[in-house]
Amino acid sequence: MLYLLPLSVSCRVPGSPPAPRSRRFLDPGGGRGVGDGLGGVRVFRRRALRGTDVRSNTSSSSSRKGRHDDARHDGGYGDDGDAGALLASVRRLLLSGSAQDDAAEGEAEEDEQGQFPKRWAIVFLCFSAFLLCNMDRVNMSIAILPMSAEFGWNPQTVGLIQSSFFWGYLLTQIAGGIWADTVGGKTVLGFGVIWWSIATALTPFAAKLGLPFLLVTRAFMGVGEGVAMPAMNNILSKWVPVSERSRSLALVYSGMYLGSVTGLAFSPLLIHNFGWPSVFYSFGSLGVFWFSTWASKAYSSPLEDPGISAEEKKLITSQTTGGEPVKEIPWGLILSKPPVWALIVSHFCHNWGTFILLTWMPTYYNQVLKFNLTESGLFCVLPWLTMAVSANFGGWIADTLVSRGLSVTTVRKIMQSIGFLGPAFFLTQLSHIDSPAMAVLCMACSQGTDAFSQSGLYSNHQDIGPRYAGVLLGLSNTAGVLAGVFGTAATGYILQHGSWDDVFKVSVVLYLVGTLVWNLFSTGEKIID
């Protein structure tokens, strides 16, 4: 048992030389000194509180007497009552000080635990980036009407302008993934947002200069948005643990859906009150504000962030790669893996149906359901809202299943099967429905179940190759964009020679092919390191 005694107390054995006055606390039983002044006090205060060396001051009076006798026997002090009182006072001081120290440490821990998780701040910034992404993408679909009237564009020219975005968007998917994986997602996503925001703001000037300038500006906008998605995937692979992966990705992608809703809602108001250029100026300026926050608050990985707590960093790095950007892309290894091709094929099958519905839906509402343009525009918003809600609901389900012990592979297959078979089922019902209200409901349900794909194939890039998540998304999304381009064009051809039922049948067949390929070849395990 350890007892603390200040040697400044006169407690020498008769005949012995006087003890030197010192502030060092010693073990009267012959132990070494452990510190001078307040440093020693702090050491023993901590020991006292933990109960490893000093008993609690709530001990009985008999125990205190026994300790007093032990110390006297060891030559600690004589029968002087003042010395005993002093010792008791010192011990009480040590224990009370230790309690205060621990209380302060506890408050610090509570403050740290109460801090908003940095990883979710990164997720929210990505969410807001993709909100702006689709706001800037859909504004042209509204502004093109007054622009066509002002500049005298025919339908063929309008189609050329609308497609010019995809020139840049398609070409930068893989390039953006390589760039993000080798440099870091922060730089690439920041570049993408500021680049497409500047291109958006310059659109009115380009339109007035002439058609070639407008086409180049829209292609430049596609370049910015093309690198954004692979960069986001790279960032989340570093920041989000697997137990939260589905929810985080669902939230970010729901930003795209809500961005479409916001853009479609505010563009007509701005055009009506301030003219069509105001849409591009206002939406483009928002990206500049976002970039200033991103540049000062975001980091490519938690290892680079000096402000993240040690507890959160440990949580993240225990479930993610969290490492430095890669130096080389192992293309041979990546392209030799069947799960990678399952991603590519499934992404193509998924986007064929999705792009057709979102691109041709206003026409379907107008020609088949006989809605006027105002009603068509209103009902076009409904699927986007449904997708935003369903994506987050599906993400919560997926993460819950993983946390309860279901394998990631099983969860990804379940969620993507819903994302394929749900739309396939509801599209087959459209040919049997006469009520416009039921047709709109079927469309909404089709897109709502489609959004479960965010917890399926869209989460799988980070599962199978977290270090190359940007490249993997670039590969699969290139196939997805091609599906959108070819599917949109093929739909026009099918409608010219067939019917809407034929359009939906092609989509259903591809959904079934995607389901088969996904369940046979996909995995949730890491296969590329």
From Swiss-Prot:
Residues 13-39, 52-78 are annotated as: Disordered. It is found in: Plastid, Chloroplast membrane. The chain crosses the membrane at residues 120-140, 158-178, 187-207, 209-229, 251-271, 274-294, 340-360, 378-398, 418-438, 469-489, 503-523. GO terms for molecular function: phosphate transmembrane transporter activity. InterPro entries: MFS, MFS_dom, MFS_Na/Anion_cotransporter, MFS_trans_sf, SLC17A9-like. It comes from the Eukaryota. The keyword Chloroplast applies. It is a multi-pass membrane protein. Residues 28-39 have a biased composition (Gly residues). Keywords: Chloroplast, Ion transport, Membrane, Plastid, Transit peptide, Transmembrane, Transmembrane helix, Transport. PROSITE patterns: MFS. GO terms for biological process: monoatomic ion transport. Residues 1-55 form a transit peptide. Coiled coil: none annotated. The keyword Transmembrane helix applies. SUPFAM superfamilies: MFS general substrate transporter. Residues 67-76 have a biased composition (Basic and acidic residues). GO terms for cellular component: chloroplast membrane. Probable anion transporter. Belongs to the major facilitator superfamily. Sodium/anion cotransporter (TC 2.A.1.14) family. This is Probable anion transporter 1, chloroplastic. The gene is PHT4;1.
